[in-house]
Amino acid sequence: MHLTELKNTPVSDLVKLGEEQMGLENLARLRKQDIVFAILKQHAKSGEDIFGGGVLEILPDGFGFLRSADSSYLAGPDDIYVSPSQIRRFNLQTGDKIEGKIRPPKEGERYFALLKVDQVNDDKPEVSRSKILFENLTPLHANSRLRMERGNGSTEDLTARILDLASPIGKGQRGLIVAPPKAGKTMLLQNIAQSITHNYPDVELIVLLIDERPEEVTEMQRSVKGEVIASTFDEPATRHVQVAEMVIEKAKRSVEHKKDVVILLDSITRLARAYNTVTPASGKILSGGVDANALHRPKRFFGAARNVEEGGSLTIIATALVDTGSKMDEVIFEEFKGTGNMELHLSRKIAERRVFPAIDFKRSGTRKEDLLTTADELQKMWILRKILNPMDEVDAMEFLIDKLMMAKTNEEFFEVMKRS
């Protein structure tokens, strides 16, 4: 029996399995994690092997637990204990994805324990020992393009195509989506996620939702094929911070194994607010009630995005909230403004006219975009900017959408533009 399979099974099926096949009682009133734990414990009595896996979180005491992505790395009874000797032996770190054989808890124990390590980050455990630490890897400018355009000519693809023209994204990009309320940032993130899973199935995608509404989390889980990790607005700030730390550590471990990872974060403003709440008071308060030391850790999160010379990349596209009426949000945005190497501005004015995507084309852009595009394409993008520059932001967007509708792909659009 495999623990991951049980976690992916709907609760109704788990209750059926436990009550009808294993003779367990009163499962319907338990949390899913408790049901999984009860089924595993019952299964272990029959003497069969049990396999499990998860993402390692090492606690200050030296031992660790394998947390599950399904429960957004929340501590639960179905977590797997990892001993300090195993952590030292395989040079394991927080964020390592581990698979192996597990054993049921003995008398006086509360958790299942890891017996044997079979895989670390989808590689043999021996490979993990010789990898270079993320901090020692050489960061470079993004030079390999992540194209958003799917080429199917749909209205959803229109957003992706405008994104490709306004601010191209590369592997290792550190992007900021600057969004006022109700400008369609969540839909834009969904669109980016769907484009990445469609065009680059080998890229590891993680959508991280901090302080979001529960219904939006469900919608994101159903519309995106990647991993969706969330901490909703009814959770404490410490939980937001723990989730974010787990996600960034997991991404770093994957990059150490030369993989390409993309994190879509909604939103960095709320994450910075959470860090501001949990950071011990330093006595220095900036305007808006932000502690002087509070923004160091969210900056470290955002700053982890990089293209790596030794192979692999970590791309982070985060949304930053503006025009919310909060002085704190303004201060947080100002702090992050110059740190990204790609900015996409959404406009309230365009969204109020019900024109979507509400992208402010003139203010959006990518640094060093010549590394991501061909000289010919770059020339055409500059000509397009010259045409749109004299126009008002709403007119520019409406004009661009009308013209893009005439062609199925951006290449066709440039051909039409050339002829006219």
From Swiss-Prot:
Q: Give the record's GO CC terms.
A: cytosol
Q: Report the residue ranges that make up the Rho RNA-BD domain in this protein.
A: 49-124
Alphabetized SMART domains for the sequence: AAA, CSP, Rho_N
Listed InterPro entries: AAA+_ATPase (IPR003593), ATPase_F1/V1/A1_a/bsu_nucl-bd (IPR000194), CSD (IPR011129), NA-bd_OB-fold (IPR012340), P-loop_NTPase (IPR027417), Rho-like_N (IPR011112), Rho_factor_ATP-bd (IPR041703), Rho_N_sf (IPR036269)
Q: Which Pfam families match?
A: ATP-synt_ab, Rho_N, Rho_RNA_bind
Judged by the first EC level, this protein's enzyme class is hydrolase
**UniProt xrefs under PROSITE patterns:** RHO_RNA_BD
Which positions does UniProt annotate for ATP binding?
G170, K171, G172, Q173, R174, G175, K182, A183, G184, K185, T186, M187, R213
Question: Which UniProt keyword terms apply here?
Answer: ATP-binding, Helicase, Hydrolase, Nucleotide-binding, RNA-binding, Transcription, Transcription regulation, Transcription termination
Gene Ontology molecular function: any one = ATP binding
Signal peptide (UniProt feature, chain positions): none
Q: What is its EC number?
A: 3.6.4.-
Q: Which GO terms describe its biological process?
A: DNA-templated transcription termination
According to its UniProt record, which protein family does this protein belong to? Belongs to the Rho family.
Quaternary arrangement and interactors, per the entry?
A: Homohexamer. The homohexamer assembles into an open ring structure.
Job of this protein? Facilitates transcription termination by a mechanism that involves Rho binding to the nascent RNA, activation of Rho's RNA-dependent ATPase activity, and release of the mRNA from the DNA template.
Q: What is this protein called?
A: Transcription termination factor Rho
Q: Which organism is it from?
A: Haemophilus influenzae (strain ATCC 51907 / DSM 11121 / KW20 / Rd)
Q: Which gene encodes it?
A: rho
